[in-house]
Amino acid sequence: MEIIVRKYGGTSLDSIAKIKKIAETTKKSINEGKKIVLVVSAMGKSTDELLKKAKMLSSHPDTRELDLLMSSGEIVSSALMSIALQELGLKAISLTGFQAGIDTNSTFGEAQIISIDNKRIHDEINNGQIVVIAGFQGYNENFEITTLGRGGSDTTAVALAASLKADICEVYTDVEGIFTADPKIVKNAKKIDYLSYEDMLELANYGAKMHPRSIELGLHYNMPIIIKSSFENKTGTIICNIEKLNDLQKRGIILNQITENRNKVTGVTSEGNISKITLHSIPD
């Protein structure tokens, strides 16, 4: 039975109605025989609100206290999601990063994952539970709560998928995938069906949806990542190597036929007033 790790970002969780919708989608997947592990971000802009409150009290909040505070948004989301799943008659349990065994270094605010002890997660899955994990967080050698910095929930999801030997890591967001350019700026931007890890890293370094650290993890562990819309049932953008893509299609995990396309510009990103063009695989 395949394991799928699904990560939902803040815009996908910013209302009770959206949480209910995700719970219904998860139930459908469970009924199809899939094992689902959910990783959730904080609801909407709640992390920004927590930081704002801390800054109202101190211009330089203690980093240990700040990480403890900032981790709470994801914990709220995970508990609410678990409650929503239980209301649909499903067995579900929420876990903090600590409870999920996510061991990090002690760099508060920008912690790096060292290892994951996934025994608790496996035990819960084997007991028929849908495990909902608070993203963006872990714990250090002194059992202090740490946060992973920008893009931390993406990093959590890919790292967990690799640790659990999941078939795929699905990242749900407010767009239907990666585009050839920012669709808010370029009206005729087109969705990209397939990207190599290397191409996605190039785009991620200059502002595309996922943080480079999560893509690097995907590359290191050969974990396929698909970026999809939380609100539309569309195919998204698959990030992996071509051999893994062929394997996923053969096994029916990726249903739409996608082929590698080498000799075209992949995408254009921008950062401030700086432009950069990188060309790959240009024919002689």
Which residues does each predicted region cover?
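Active-site proximal loops enriched in glycine and acidic residues that flank catalytic Cys/His/Asp
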Residues: 173, 229, 281-283
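Short gly/pro-enriched beta-turn/loop segments at secondary-structure junctions
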Residues: 164, 220-221, 270-274
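A conserved regulatory-domain signal marking ACT and ACT-like small-molecule sensing domains
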Residues: 238-284
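Conserved glycine-bearing catalytic or ligand-binding loops at nucleotide- and phosphate-handling centers
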Residues: 207-212, 217-237
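Generic structural hydrophobic/aromatic packing signal, biased to beta-strands
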Residues: 50, 94, 200, 225-227, ...
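Nucleotide/pyrophosphate-binding catalytic subdomain
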Residues: 1-215, 219
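A broad, low-specificity signal marking well-ordered, structured residues that form hydrophobic/aromatic
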Residues: 131, 146, 225, 237, ...
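Internal nucleotide-binding/catalytic subdomain
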Residues: 170, 227, 232, 244-249
